[in-house]
């Protein structure tokens, strides 16, 4: 959310695009993720949400976007994002990939960490936006691993 807020200050229009990856099964459907993103971004009038399948470069071409913005928390993020940015550059030279370092307060926050906390019955509400925190917490209940 921090990267989205900062992007909204930097750009006239921001599209938060959710990849529909049929190879992955997430806690929430793409439609549910879009719904939650819309609520989280409701106070940012220049932010809209969308979803896509396939290559990011194809989506960027189709929507005529000029920039792909990626948030980075660590060197490990850079190590995985940089090769993808290079491939996207080869597929679509007219689009730029920009990297925005995460706010230090969010360096340890990731969807994997939130999933781990939720699966073990921990309180995820401090780590997700308040307007969706209860919904996210409830979604973990059927998957929780009992703690001793």
PLM features: residue spans?
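Nucleotidyltransferase catalytic core that binds NTPs
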Residues: 1-148
């Amino acid at each position: 959310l921090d990267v989205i807020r900062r992007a909204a200050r930097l750009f006239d229009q921001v599209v938060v695009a959710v990849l529909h990856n049929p190879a992955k099964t997430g806690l929430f459907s793409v439609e549910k993720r879009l719904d939650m993103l819309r609520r989280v971004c409701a106070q940012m009038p220049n932010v809209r949400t969308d979803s896509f399948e396939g290559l990011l470069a194809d989506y960027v071409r189709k929507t005529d976007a000029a920039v792909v913005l990626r948030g980075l928390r660590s060197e490990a993020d850079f190590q995985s994002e940089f090769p993808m940015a290079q491939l996207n550059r080869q597929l679509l030279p007219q689009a730029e990939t920009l990297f925005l370092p995460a706010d230090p307060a969010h360096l340890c926050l990731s969807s994997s960490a939130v999933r781990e906390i939720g699966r073990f019955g921990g309180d995820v509400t401090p780590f997700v936006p308040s307007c969706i925190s209860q919904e996210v917490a409830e979604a973990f209940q059927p998957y929780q691993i009992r703690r001793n």
